[in-house]
């Protein structure tokens, strides 16, 4: 067991009693090794039942956070994964995720690059097919966020970058993957509670998440006749490296406290939603968004 897996397996009681301190990281999307404590990526006693046996999934942002937990749960269910991560700073986390997937008896391909580049997205699909021969599940999960006190503080560069990473990338990668997705395939997009509630300091980020929700619904309609399902997951406050890489230590210390359950969620509490949407358990579900947010009721 690698050091990065210490304290990353938990039960319901561990989720409820989880304590975190104020902390901050300098660069997004943040890395596991600098977090104290680590997020909980696996559920104690979880046993897969081959729901994704022999399937191949591309998971963006799969090196840490939500994407990492999704990749591990997919491996428990028999899937091989392609993990796409942004830069060299995330390599250690990506390798730890790959190690865990391989411990579970599945294969994992790591690819580093900028998902805001359409050519790179095409290469991701190309390398996936060269390695595994087919593609069954696409999880569009990678994102970035940069809080600002005012709309006037959002530079043109930040606006363009946030939209390119968060929503343009989904268009690019989905377009690249679509010719190779067959009947029964599943596309899962990570949106956010901010798409429904808004966020006064994440105006551009929340706007991209609203766009993702509309993208999900529209694409689901477009692909229904091809029997390819498209759904979304809207996380609430989830404890991932992106949080200390986004907010001040003071805000991180109280992150999640405003949720109805009075705590942040863990990636392991979110990943089973992706398993459901990727598997044949959800064959009559498309165009929907699952809200995993600690009890907040949203209309959408």
Walk through the language-model features, giving the residues of each:
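Short C-terminal tail/terminal secondary-structure segment
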Residues: 3-9, 35, 43-44, 148, ...
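Catalytic Tyr-X3-Lys loop
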Residues: 136, 152-171, 188, 212, ...
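Alpha-helical segment proximal to the catalytic Tyr-Lys
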Residues: 179, 221-225, 283
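Residue(s) in the substrate-gating loop at a strand-loop-helix junction
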Residues: 192
């Amino acid at each position: 067991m690698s050091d990065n897996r210490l304290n990353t397996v938990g039960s319901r009681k561990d989720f409820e009693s989880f304590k975190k301190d104020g902390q901050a990281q300098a660069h997004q999307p943040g890395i596991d090794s600098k977090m104290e404590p680590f997020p909980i990526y696996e559920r104690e006693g979880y046993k897969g039942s081959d729901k994704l046996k022999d399937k191949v999934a591309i998971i963006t942002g799969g090196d840490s956070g939500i994407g990492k937990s999704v990749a591990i749960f997919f491996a428990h269910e028999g899937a091989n994964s392609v993990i796409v991560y942004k830069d060299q700073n995330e390599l250690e986390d990506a390798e730890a995720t790959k190690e865990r997937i391989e411990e579970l008896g599945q294969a994992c391909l790591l690819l580093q690059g900028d998902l805001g580049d359409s050519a790179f997205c095409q290469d991701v699909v190309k390398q996936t097919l060269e390695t595994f021969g087919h593609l069954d599940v696409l999880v569009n999960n990678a994102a970035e966020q940069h809080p600002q006190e005012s709309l006037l503080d959002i530079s043109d560069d930040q606006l363009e970058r946030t939209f390119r990473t968060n929503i343009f990338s989904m268009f690019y990668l989905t377009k690249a993957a679509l010719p190779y997705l067959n009947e029964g395939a599943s596309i899962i997009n990570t949106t956010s509670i901010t798409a429904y509630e808004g966020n006064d300091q994440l105006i551009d980020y929340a706007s991209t998440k609203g766009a993702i929700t509309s993208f999900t619904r529209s694409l689901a309609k477009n692909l229904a006749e091809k029997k390819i399902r498209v759904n979304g997951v809207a996380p609430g406050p989830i404890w991932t490296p992106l949080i200390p890489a986004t907010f001040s230590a003071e805000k991180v210390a109280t992150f999640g406290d405003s949720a109805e359950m009075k705590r942040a969620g863990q990636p392991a509490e979110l990943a089973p939603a992706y398993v459901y949407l990727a598997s044949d358990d959800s064959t009559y579900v498309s165009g929907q968004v699952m809200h995993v947010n600690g009890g907040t009721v949203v209309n959408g």
